[in-house]
């Protein structure tokens, strides 16, 4: 038994001293492998008398169990140590300067950048950001916004509908961010001043349209709100966004079910071969739609139109990003081409501010 105790002690010491998993495996094979020292002792049990086999077998198996447990514990310690070493080697100091190459540094997508620019501009004017779900109800997307039954926008070729529920309702992918305005008016009392950026969906795909696109809408509800306020907000936005000192705007009569009167807005521009200059030239370009919130919409949202008035506007984020940064094909924004993103994308630390410059 003294030889067995000595062997057990030597093996346990070797297990404890194993510097890595390879060395530990060598100890295991030397002790418990086919030709290992403990395995060799077990093979001698067949030559012993029953009384000796019972005594020696119990002692050898006890030693085997101790070695097995020690191997398992040491293997776990080595695994944890290896993981700690790997984590330490991969630690990144976030206070260090970022790498310079685009492939290593990454790029902010132009749409994300423009959404940040919009947020900075309207936040400076005192607007809050409101958000809502992409999957909407027919009531919020159409009915409460004064879309009568049978309106073309309700048809399948414009809207992505889901299967009807048991109660007969039919969810849909929102076709504009106007449902967020509805939810805002239902959840808070005037005065209201919000912008609603987000994804929208329509069955359309060509050079200037995609089935999923981004839109931002603005809403102001207050006593005495009028078109003069709307014109000032849009004018200040265009000057800040396109980074020009002055911009001439043209309001044309139009029709939207949720506003009355409704208008489309053009801004003065000069078209070059590969770019468009705003605030100069003798051409015009439509950029958004707007109008005074229809009294029916206010009523549907629990607001008295005899006390409060409001105005709203909406524009495509993808479209104004294309105009500002000279992107010719909307579909390229969603193709995931790293070369395209390296060219049109922004550095991660290019956070747009009015003081520091939106796109500098």
Curated annotation (Swiss-Prot):
GO terms for molecular function: ATP binding; magnesium ion binding; phenylalanine-tRNA ligase activity; tRNA binding. Its cofactor is Mg(2+). The keyword Protein biosynthesis applies. Pfam families: Phe_tRNA-synt_N, tRNA-synt_2d. It is found in: Cytoplasm. Binds 2 magnesium ions per tetramer. Keywords: Aminoacyl-tRNA synthetase, ATP-binding, Cytoplasm, Ligase, Magnesium, Metal-binding, Nucleotide-binding, Protein biosynthesis. CDD domains: PheRS_alpha_core (cd00496). GO terms for cellular component: cytoplasm. InterPro entries: aa-tRNA-synth_II (IPR006195), aa-tRNA-synth_II/BPL/LPL (IPR045864), Phe-tRNA-synth_IIc_asu (IPR004529), Phe-tRNA_ligase_II_N (IPR004188), Phe_tRNA_ligase_alpha1_bac (IPR022911), Phenylalanyl-tRNA_Synthase (IPR002319), tRNA-bd_arm (IPR010978). GO terms for biological process: phenylalanyl-tRNA aminoacylation. Its EC number is 6.1.1.20. It catalyses: tRNA(Phe) + L-phenylalanine + ATP = L-phenylalanyl-tRNA(Phe) + AMP + diphosphate + H(+). Mg(2+) binds at residue 260. It is an enzyme of class 6 (ligase). Tetramer of two alpha and two beta subunits. Belongs to the class-II aminoacyl-tRNA synthetase family. Phe-tRNA synthetase alpha subunit type 1 subfamily. NCBIfam families: pheS. This is Phenylalanine--tRNA ligase alpha subunit.
């Amino acid at each position: 038994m003294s030889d067995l105790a000595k062997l057990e002690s030597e093996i346990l010491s070797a297990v404890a001293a194993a510097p890595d998993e390879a060395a530990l495996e060598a100890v295991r094979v030397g002790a418990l492998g086919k030709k290992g020292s403990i395995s060799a002792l077990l093979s001698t049990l067949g030559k012993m008398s029953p009384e000796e086999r019972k005594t020696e077998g119990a002692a050898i198996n006890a030693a085997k169990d101790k070695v097995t447990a020690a191997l398992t514990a040491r293997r776990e310690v080595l695994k944890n140590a290896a993981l700690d070493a790997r984590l330490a080697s991969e630690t990144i100091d976030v206070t260090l300067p970022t790498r310079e190459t685009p492939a290593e540094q990454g790029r902010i997508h132009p749409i994300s950048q423009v959404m940040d620019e919009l947020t900075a501009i309207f936040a400076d004017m005192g607007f809050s950001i409101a958000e809502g779900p992409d999957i909407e109800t027919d009531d919020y997307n159409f009915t409460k916004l004064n879309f009568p039954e049978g309106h073309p926008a309700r048809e399948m070729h414009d809207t992505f509908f889901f299967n009807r529920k048991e109660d007969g309702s039919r969810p849909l992918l929102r076709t504009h961010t106007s449902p967020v305005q509805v939810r805002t008016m239902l959840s808070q009392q005037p005065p209201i001043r919000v912008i609603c950026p987000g994804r929208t969906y329509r069955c359309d795909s060509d050079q200037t349209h995609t089935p999923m696109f981004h839109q931002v809408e603005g809403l102001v509800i207050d006593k005495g709100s009028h078109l003069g306020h709307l014109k000032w907000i849009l004018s200040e936005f265009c000057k800040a966004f396109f980074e020009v000192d002055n911009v001439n705007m043209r309001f044309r009569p139009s029709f939207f079910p949720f506003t009355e009167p409704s208008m489309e807005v053009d801004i003065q521009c000069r078209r070059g071969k590969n770019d468009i200059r705003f605030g100069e030239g003798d051409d015009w370009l439509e950029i958004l739609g707007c109008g005074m919130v229809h009294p029916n919409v206010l009523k549907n949202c629990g607001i008295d139109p005899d006390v409060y008035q409001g105005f709203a506007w909406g524009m495509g984020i993808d479209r104004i990003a294309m105009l500002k940064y000279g992107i010719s094909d909307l579909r390229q924004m969603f193709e995931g081409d790293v070369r395209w993103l390296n060219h049109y994308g922004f550095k991660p630390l290019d956070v747009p501010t009015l003081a520091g410059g939106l796109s500098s």
